[in-house]
Protein backbone atom coordinates (compact mmCIF):
# COMPACT_ATOMS: atom_id res chain seq x y z
CA UNK A 1 0.00 0.00 0.00
CA UNK A 2 1.37 3.43 -0.94
CA UNK A 3 1.95 6.25 1.54
CA UNK A 4 -1.02 8.16 0.11
CA UNK A 5 -3.27 5.10 0.39
CA UNK A 6 -2.19 4.51 3.98
CA UNK A 7 -2.80 8.16 4.81
CA UNK A 8 -6.25 7.99 3.26
CA UNK A 9 -6.98 4.74 5.11
CA UNK A 10 -5.79 6.21 8.40
CA UNK A 11 -7.81 9.35 7.82
CA UNK A 12 -10.95 7.38 7.08
CA UNK A 13 -10.37 5.28 10.21
CA UNK A 14 -10.04 8.43 12.33
CA UNK A 15 -13.18 9.90 10.77
CA UNK A 16 -15.03 6.65 11.45
CA UNK A 17 -13.86 6.60 15.08
CA UNK A 18 -14.77 10.27 15.45
CA UNK A 19 -18.22 9.56 13.99
CA UNK A 20 -18.76 6.68 16.41
CA UNK A 21 -17.69 8.79 19.37
CA UNK A 22 -19.82 11.74 18.32
CA UNK A 23 -22.79 9.45 17.77
CA UNK A 24 -22.34 7.94 21.24
CA UNK A 25 -21.98 11.43 22.71
CA UNK A 26 -25.19 12.54 21.00
CA UNK A 27 -27.04 9.52 22.38
CA UNK A 28 -25.67 10.16 25.87
CA UNK A 29 -26.63 13.84 25.70
CA UNK A 30 -30.12 13.18 24.34
CA UNK A 31 -32.68 14.79 26.70
CA UNK A 32 -34.52 11.48 27.11
CA UNK A 33 -31.42 9.30 27.54
CA UNK A 34 -31.73 9.33 31.35
CA UNK A 35 -35.38 8.32 31.06
CA UNK A 36 -34.58 5.38 28.78
CA UNK A 37 -31.58 4.24 30.84
CA UNK A 38 -33.63 4.17 34.05
CA UNK A 39 -36.52 2.41 32.34
CA UNK A 40 -34.35 -0.10 30.47
CA UNK A 41 -32.17 -1.14 33.40
CA UNK A 42 -35.22 -1.41 35.67
CA UNK A 43 -37.12 -3.65 33.25
CA UNK A 44 -34.10 -5.88 32.66
CA UNK A 45 -33.49 -6.32 36.39
CA UNK A 46 -37.19 -6.99 36.94
CA UNK A 47 -37.29 -9.56 34.13
CA UNK A 48 -34.15 -11.29 35.37
CA UNK A 49 -35.60 -11.30 38.88
CA UNK A 50 -38.79 -13.02 37.73
CA UNK A 51 -36.83 -15.73 35.95
CA UNK A 52 -34.51 -16.30 38.90
CA UNK A 53 -37.35 -16.31 41.45
CA UNK A 54 -39.04 -19.02 39.36
CA UNK A 55 -35.87 -21.09 39.51
CA UNK A 56 -34.73 -20.33 43.08
CA UNK A 57 -38.17 -20.69 44.71
CA UNK A 58 -39.28 -23.89 42.97
CA UNK A 59 -38.06 -26.31 45.66
CA UNK A 60 -39.41 -24.24 48.56
CA UNK A 61 -42.68 -23.75 46.67
CA UNK A 62 -43.14 -27.50 46.23
CA UNK A 63 -42.33 -28.13 49.88
CA UNK A 64 -44.82 -25.56 51.21
CA UNK A 65 -47.56 -25.43 48.57
CA UNK A 66 -47.17 -28.63 46.56
CA UNK A 67 -46.50 -26.71 43.34
CA UNK A 68 -43.22 -25.44 41.92
CA UNK A 69 -44.88 -22.31 40.54
CA UNK A 70 -46.87 -20.83 43.44
CA UNK A 71 -44.21 -18.41 44.71
CA UNK A 72 -43.21 -17.45 41.17
CA UNK A 73 -46.85 -16.75 40.30
CA UNK A 74 -47.17 -14.50 43.33
CA UNK A 75 -44.01 -12.65 42.36
CA UNK A 76 -45.39 -12.21 38.84
CA UNK A 77 -48.56 -10.77 40.37
CA UNK A 78 -46.48 -8.37 42.47
CA UNK A 79 -44.51 -7.39 39.37
CA UNK A 80 -47.67 -6.69 37.34
CA UNK A 81 -49.13 -4.62 40.17
CA UNK A 82 -45.84 -2.78 40.60
CA UNK A 83 -45.54 -2.17 36.85
CA UNK A 84 -49.05 -0.66 36.75
CA UNK A 85 -48.12 1.55 39.71
CA UNK A 86 -44.89 2.52 37.92
CA UNK A 87 -46.81 3.57 34.81
CA UNK A 88 -49.22 5.72 36.82
CA UNK A 89 -46.30 7.20 38.76
CA UNK A 90 -44.39 7.96 35.56
CA UNK A 91 -47.44 9.75 34.14
CA UNK A 92 -47.90 11.89 37.25
CA UNK A 93 -46.67 15.45 37.58
CA UNK A 94 -43.99 16.58 39.99
CA UNK A 95 -46.62 18.70 41.72
CA UNK A 96 -48.63 15.56 42.48
CA UNK A 97 -45.72 14.07 44.41
CA UNK A 98 -45.05 17.30 46.23
CA UNK A 99 -48.67 17.76 47.25
CA UNK A 100 -48.91 14.11 48.37
CA UNK A 101 -45.78 14.21 50.56
CA UNK A 102 -47.56 14.68 53.89
CA UNK A 103 -50.14 12.05 52.95
CA UNK A 104 -47.38 9.51 52.31
CA UNK A 105 -45.75 10.39 55.63
CA UNK A 106 -49.04 10.05 57.54
CA UNK A 107 -49.77 6.66 55.95
CA UNK A 108 -46.24 5.45 56.72
CA UNK A 109 -46.48 6.40 60.40
CA UNK A 110 -49.97 4.93 60.62
CA UNK A 111 -48.74 1.59 59.28
CA UNK A 112 -45.61 1.61 61.47
CA UNK A 113 -47.74 2.20 64.57
CA UNK A 114 -50.33 -0.37 63.47
CA UNK A 115 -47.75 -3.12 63.08
CA UNK A 116 -46.78 -2.71 66.74
CA UNK A 117 -50.37 -3.61 67.66
CA UNK A 118 -51.66 -6.00 65.00
CA UNK A 119 -48.38 -7.12 63.42
CA UNK A 120 -47.56 -10.76 62.85
CA UNK A 121 -44.16 -12.33 63.39
CA UNK A 122 -42.26 -13.75 60.43
CA UNK A 123 -38.72 -15.15 60.79
CA UNK A 124 -38.40 -13.67 64.26
CA UNK A 125 -39.45 -10.15 63.24
CA UNK A 126 -42.84 -8.65 64.08
CA UNK A 127 -42.92 -6.28 61.12
CA UNK A 128 -45.73 -7.62 58.93
CA UNK A 129 -49.45 -6.85 58.67
CA UNK A 130 -51.84 -9.51 57.37
CA UNK A 131 -53.88 -8.16 54.44
CA UNK A 132 -55.88 -11.08 53.10
CA UNK A 133 -55.14 -14.72 52.46
CA UNK A 134 -51.42 -15.32 51.98
CA UNK A 135 -50.61 -11.66 51.31
CA UNK A 136 -48.80 -9.54 53.90
CA UNK A 137 -47.55 -5.96 54.00
CA UNK A 138 -44.23 -4.81 55.45
CA UNK A 139 -44.71 -1.15 56.51
CA UNK A 140 -40.99 -0.45 56.78
CA UNK A 141 -40.68 -0.83 53.00
CA UNK A 142 -43.38 1.78 52.41
CA UNK A 143 -41.68 4.03 54.98
CA UNK A 144 -38.62 4.28 52.70
CA UNK A 145 -40.75 5.64 49.86
CA UNK A 146 -42.52 8.06 52.22
CA UNK A 147 -39.23 9.39 53.62
CA UNK A 148 -37.90 10.07 50.11
CA UNK A 149 -41.00 12.01 48.99
CA UNK A 150 -41.59 13.89 52.24
CA UNK A 151 -37.91 14.66 52.85
CA UNK A 152 -37.46 16.03 49.33
CA UNK A 153 -40.57 18.20 49.65
CA UNK A 154 -39.63 19.63 53.07
CA UNK A 155 -36.09 20.50 51.99
CA UNK A 156 -37.35 21.98 48.71
CA UNK A 157 -39.49 24.43 50.66
CA UNK A 158 -36.64 25.25 53.03
CA UNK A 159 -34.27 25.73 50.09
CA UNK A 160 -36.26 28.81 49.10
CA UNK A 161 -36.74 30.39 52.51
CA UNK A 162 -34.21 29.12 55.07
CA UNK A 163 -30.72 28.53 53.62
CA UNK A 164 -28.96 27.71 56.92
CA UNK A 165 -28.06 24.06 57.49
CA UNK A 166 -29.25 24.16 61.11
CA UNK A 167 -32.80 24.84 60.00
CA UNK A 168 -32.54 22.31 57.18
CA UNK A 169 -31.96 19.53 59.73
CA UNK A 170 -35.33 20.27 61.38
CA UNK A 171 -37.81 18.62 61.01
CA UNK A 172 -36.39 16.03 58.63
CA UNK A 173 -33.80 14.53 61.01
CA UNK A 174 -36.11 14.20 64.07
CA UNK A 175 -38.91 12.71 61.94
CA UNK A 176 -36.52 10.26 60.26
CA UNK A 177 -35.07 9.22 63.64
CA UNK A 178 -38.58 8.56 65.02
CA UNK A 179 -39.32 6.50 61.92
CA UNK A 180 -36.11 4.50 62.42
CA UNK A 181 -36.97 3.85 66.07
CA UNK A 182 -40.40 2.49 65.10
CA UNK A 183 -38.86 0.22 62.47
CA UNK A 184 -36.23 -0.93 64.96
CA UNK A 185 -38.92 -1.76 67.53
CA UNK A 186 -40.33 -4.17 64.95
CA UNK A 187 -36.97 -5.96 64.81
CA UNK A 188 -36.13 -4.76 61.28
CA UNK A 189 -32.50 -3.69 61.61
CA UNK A 190 -31.83 -3.85 57.86
CA UNK A 191 -34.50 -1.32 56.89
CA UNK A 192 -33.44 0.91 59.79
CA UNK A 193 -30.07 1.17 58.07
CA UNK A 194 -31.79 1.85 54.75
CA UNK A 195 -33.79 4.74 56.21
CA UNK A 196 -30.52 6.18 57.53
CA UNK A 197 -28.98 5.81 54.05
CA UNK A 198 -31.91 7.61 52.43
CA UNK A 199 -31.67 10.43 54.97
CA UNK A 200 -27.94 10.84 54.33
CA UNK A 201 -28.45 10.82 50.56
CA UNK A 202 -31.08 13.57 50.70
CA UNK A 203 -29.07 15.70 53.13
CA UNK A 204 -25.93 15.34 51.01
CA UNK A 205 -27.82 16.49 47.91
CA UNK A 206 -29.19 19.41 49.94
CA UNK A 207 -25.65 20.61 50.55
CA UNK A 208 -25.17 19.77 54.21
CA UNK A 209 -21.48 20.31 55.19
CA UNK A 210 -19.35 17.17 55.00
CA UNK A 211 -18.18 17.61 58.60
CA UNK A 212 -21.73 16.96 59.75
CA UNK A 213 -21.66 13.57 58.06
CA UNK A 214 -18.59 12.72 60.12
CA UNK A 215 -20.60 13.54 63.24
CA UNK A 216 -23.59 11.53 61.97
CA UNK A 217 -21.25 8.66 61.14
CA UNK A 218 -19.75 8.63 64.64
CA UNK A 219 -23.18 8.76 66.29
CA UNK A 220 -24.46 6.07 63.94
CA UNK A 221 -21.49 3.81 64.63
CA UNK A 222 -22.00 3.95 68.39
CA UNK A 223 -25.75 3.46 67.96
CA UNK A 224 -25.22 0.37 65.79
CA UNK A 225 -22.64 -0.97 68.24
CA UNK A 226 -25.02 -0.48 71.18
CA UNK A 227 -27.86 -2.19 69.30
CA UNK A 228 -25.53 -5.05 68.40
CA UNK A 229 -24.52 -5.57 72.02
CA UNK A 230 -28.19 -5.44 73.08
CA UNK A 231 -29.19 -8.32 70.77
CA UNK A 232 -27.20 -11.58 71.05
CA UNK A 233 -28.14 -12.75 67.54
CA UNK A 234 -26.72 -9.54 66.05
CA UNK A 235 -23.51 -10.04 68.01
CA UNK A 236 -23.32 -13.58 66.66
CA UNK A 237 -23.59 -12.23 63.12
CA UNK A 238 -20.83 -9.69 63.69
CA UNK A 239 -18.60 -12.31 65.32
CA UNK A 240 -19.16 -14.73 62.45
CA UNK A 241 -18.51 -11.98 59.91
CA UNK A 242 -15.18 -11.16 61.55
CA UNK A 243 -14.30 -14.85 61.97
CA UNK A 244 -16.19 -17.02 59.42
CA UNK A 245 -14.78 -20.23 60.92
CA UNK A 246 -16.20 -19.53 64.40
CA UNK A 247 -19.67 -20.93 63.62
CA UNK A 248 -19.70 -22.18 60.05
CA UNK A 249 -22.47 -24.71 60.77
CA UNK A 250 -24.61 -22.15 62.61
CA UNK A 251 -24.79 -18.42 61.85
CA UNK A 252 -22.12 -18.77 59.18
CA UNK A 253 -23.91 -21.52 57.26
CA UNK A 254 -25.92 -19.25 54.97
CA UNK A 255 -22.93 -17.16 53.91
CA UNK A 256 -20.66 -20.18 53.41
CA UNK A 257 -23.27 -21.93 51.25
CA UNK A 258 -23.85 -18.75 49.28
CA UNK A 259 -20.16 -18.44 48.54
CA UNK A 260 -20.00 -22.12 47.63
CA UNK A 261 -22.84 -21.55 45.14
CA UNK A 262 -21.00 -18.61 43.58
CA UNK A 263 -17.82 -20.69 43.28
CA UNK A 264 -19.68 -23.64 41.77
CA UNK A 265 -21.07 -21.51 38.94
CA UNK A 266 -17.70 -20.66 37.45
CA UNK A 267 -17.74 -18.38 34.41
CA UNK A 268 -20.84 -19.61 32.57
CA UNK A 269 -22.83 -21.29 35.35
CA UNK A 270 -24.38 -24.72 35.62
CA UNK A 271 -27.41 -23.67 33.58
CA UNK A 272 -30.74 -22.05 34.36
CA UNK A 273 -32.66 -24.19 36.84
CA UNK A 274 -29.62 -26.35 37.62
CA UNK A 275 -28.77 -25.00 41.07
CA UNK A 276 -28.10 -27.60 43.75
CA UNK A 277 -27.95 -25.15 46.65
CA UNK A 278 -31.63 -24.23 46.31
CA UNK A 279 -32.56 -27.80 47.30
CA UNK A 280 -32.28 -26.86 50.96
CA UNK A 281 -28.60 -26.17 51.53
CA UNK A 282 -28.98 -22.41 51.01
CA UNK A 283 -31.59 -20.71 53.25
CA UNK A 284 -33.66 -17.88 51.72
CA UNK A 285 -32.47 -18.79 48.23
CA UNK A 286 -35.29 -16.86 46.54
CA UNK A 287 -35.21 -13.79 48.83
CA UNK A 288 -32.12 -12.36 50.52
CA UNK A 289 -29.70 -14.87 48.97
CA UNK A 290 -30.91 -14.96 45.37
CA UNK A 291 -27.59 -13.50 44.15
CA UNK A 292 -25.67 -16.75 44.85
CA UNK A 293 -28.28 -18.69 42.86
CA UNK A 294 -27.71 -16.30 39.95
CA UNK A 295 -23.98 -16.94 40.25
CA UNK A 296 -24.44 -20.70 40.43
CA UNK A 297 -26.83 -20.97 37.47
CA UNK A 298 -25.59 -18.13 35.24
CA UNK A 299 -22.00 -17.91 36.44
CA UNK A 300 -19.73 -14.90 36.48
CA UNK A 301 -21.44 -13.69 33.32
CA UNK A 302 -24.81 -13.54 35.08
CA UNK A 303 -23.55 -11.84 38.23
CA UNK A 304 -21.55 -9.35 36.14
CA UNK A 305 -24.69 -8.54 34.16
CA UNK A 306 -26.56 -7.84 37.41
CA UNK A 307 -23.78 -5.55 38.63
CA UNK A 308 -23.68 -3.78 35.26
CA UNK A 309 -27.44 -3.17 35.29
CA UNK A 310 -27.30 -1.80 38.83
CA UNK A 311 -24.38 0.39 37.74
CA UNK A 312 -26.38 1.77 34.81
CA UNK A 313 -29.41 2.37 37.03
CA UNK A 314 -27.28 4.14 39.65
CA UNK A 315 -25.51 6.27 37.02
CA UNK A 316 -28.83 7.31 35.49
CA UNK A 317 -30.49 8.20 38.79
CA UNK A 318 -27.57 10.24 40.12
CA UNK A 319 -27.19 11.87 36.71
CA UNK A 320 -30.81 13.01 37.00
CA UNK A 321 -30.08 14.32 40.50
CA UNK A 322 -26.97 16.18 39.38
CA UNK A 323 -28.38 17.74 36.20
CA UNK A 324 -31.87 18.72 37.33
CA UNK A 325 -32.56 22.36 38.14
CA UNK A 326 -35.63 21.39 40.18
CA UNK A 327 -34.70 21.07 43.88
CA UNK A 328 -37.37 18.41 44.50
CA UNK A 329 -36.12 16.27 41.62
CA UNK A 330 -32.51 16.63 42.74
CA UNK A 331 -33.32 15.59 46.31
CA UNK A 332 -35.79 12.81 45.47
CA UNK A 333 -33.40 11.25 42.95
CA UNK A 334 -30.59 11.34 45.52
CA UNK A 335 -32.84 9.63 48.06
CA UNK A 336 -33.99 6.88 45.69
CA UNK A 337 -30.47 6.38 44.35
CA UNK A 338 -29.07 5.99 47.87
CA UNK A 339 -31.87 3.57 48.71
CA UNK A 340 -31.40 1.25 45.73
CA UNK A 341 -27.60 1.41 45.48
CA UNK A 342 -26.82 0.98 49.18
CA UNK A 343 -29.40 -1.79 49.56
CA UNK A 344 -27.85 -3.65 46.63
CA UNK A 345 -24.35 -3.13 48.07
CA UNK A 346 -25.43 -4.39 51.52
CA UNK A 347 -27.14 -7.45 50.02
CA UNK A 348 -24.31 -8.44 47.68
CA UNK A 349 -21.65 -7.49 50.23
CA UNK A 350 -23.24 -9.85 52.78
CA UNK A 351 -23.28 -12.69 50.24
CA UNK A 352 -19.58 -12.16 49.51
CA UNK A 353 -18.72 -11.98 53.20
CA UNK A 354 -17.63 -8.35 52.94
CA UNK A 355 -20.47 -7.12 55.19
CA UNK A 356 -22.56 -8.68 57.98
CA UNK A 357 -25.91 -10.22 57.02
CA UNK A 358 -28.73 -7.74 57.71
CA UNK A 359 -31.63 -9.38 55.90
CA UNK A 360 -32.29 -6.83 53.15
CA UNK A 361 -33.39 -8.15 49.72
CA UNK A 362 -31.73 -7.42 46.40
CA UNK A 363 -33.80 -4.59 44.86
CA UNK A 364 -36.01 -5.54 41.88
CA UNK A 365 -34.63 -9.10 41.89
CA UNK A 366 -35.47 -10.82 45.20
CA UNK A 367 -38.89 -12.29 45.95
CA UNK A 368 -41.32 -10.05 47.84
CA UNK A 369 -44.07 -7.63 46.90
CA UNK A 370 -43.58 -5.34 49.91
CA UNK A 371 -40.10 -4.53 48.66
CA UNK A 372 -40.78 -4.64 44.92
CA UNK A 373 -43.86 -2.42 44.65
CA UNK A 374 -42.51 0.62 46.58
CA UNK A 375 -39.25 0.35 44.65
CA UNK A 376 -41.11 0.41 41.32
CA UNK A 377 -43.24 3.35 42.48
CA UNK A 378 -40.11 5.30 43.41
CA UNK A 379 -38.59 4.56 40.00
CA UNK A 380 -41.85 5.62 38.34
CA UNK A 381 -41.61 8.93 40.19
CA UNK A 382 -38.09 9.41 38.83
CA UNK A 383 -39.31 8.61 35.32
CA UNK A 384 -41.93 11.34 35.75
CA UNK A 385 -39.16 13.71 36.83
CA UNK A 386 -37.00 12.73 33.84
CA UNK A 387 -39.93 13.27 31.46
CA UNK A 388 -40.49 16.74 32.89
CA UNK A 389 -36.97 17.99 32.31
CA UNK A 390 -37.08 20.99 29.87
CA UNK A 391 -35.36 19.25 26.95
CA UNK A 392 -37.41 16.08 27.41
CA UNK A 393 -40.68 18.04 27.46
CA UNK A 394 -39.82 19.68 24.14
CA UNK A 395 -39.11 16.34 22.47
CA UNK A 396 -42.28 14.76 23.87
CA UNK A 397 -44.37 17.72 22.63
CA UNK A 398 -42.82 17.44 19.16
CA UNK A 399 -43.55 13.71 19.05
CA UNK A 400 -47.13 14.28 20.19
CA UNK A 401 -47.60 16.99 17.55
CA UNK A 402 -46.15 14.76 14.82
CA UNK A 403 -48.37 11.86 15.87
CA UNK A 404 -51.45 14.10 15.83
CA UNK A 405 -50.59 15.35 12.32
CA UNK A 406 -50.18 11.78 11.04
CA UNK A 407 -53.65 10.88 12.32
CA UNK A 408 -55.29 13.70 10.30
Where are these regions (language model features)?
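A juxtamembrane structural motif centered on a specific transmembrane helix
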Residues: 1-20, 24-25, 347-408
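Glycine/serine-rich anion-binding loops at beta->alpha junctions
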Residues: 133-143, 185-187, 266-271, 360-372
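N-terminal membrane topogenic signal
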Residues: 27-42
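Active-site-proximal inter-transmembrane loops
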Residues: 127-134, 252, 280, 355-363, ...
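TM-adjacent membrane-interface loops and short helices in multi-pass inner/ER membrane proteins
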Residues: 240, 244-291, 298-302
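Hydrophobic alpha-helical transmembrane segments of multi-pass inner membrane proteins, especially
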Residues: 39-55, 61-254, 292-350, 377-381, ...
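Short, small-residue-rich loop/turn micro-motifs
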Residues: 57-58, 262, 266, 352
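Transmembrane helix boundary and interhelical junction motifs in multipass membrane proteins
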Residues: 188-193, 270-275, 285-287, 304, ...
